[in-house]
Amino acid sequence: MKGQRIRIKLQGFDYRVIDQSALEIVETAKRSGARVSGPIPLPTRVEKLSVNRSPHVDKKSMEQFETRTHKRLIDIIEPTAQTVDELKKLNLPSGVDITINV
């Protein structure tokens, strides 16, 4: 697979799980003989939500919630057939969303 590149994007709410998954992917790719670039941390998306504490008089009293979506990017440069097979067999945690582009 000369000249090809596999781009893996990881997303999740817990950065520790994402970093652990990224480390597993990098180790698997290096073991199979491919070059790896990353994991590259991408900007964290923060969504904030403000909700009234009381449905009646206290309009100024609001409670704030936020969700943080952490992202990592891994490029596998010149993957071999063994690399693709090993990545298919890899078992990753359920808190990680994985997008793969070839």
From Swiss-Prot:
It comes from the Bacteria. One of its GO terms (biological process) is translation. The keyword Ribosomal protein applies. PROSITE patterns: RIBOSOMAL_S10. Belongs to the universal ribosomal protein uS10 family. Part of the 30S ribosomal subunit. This is Small ribosomal subunit protein uS10. It comes from Opitutus terrae (strain DSM 11246 / JCM 15787 / PB90-1).
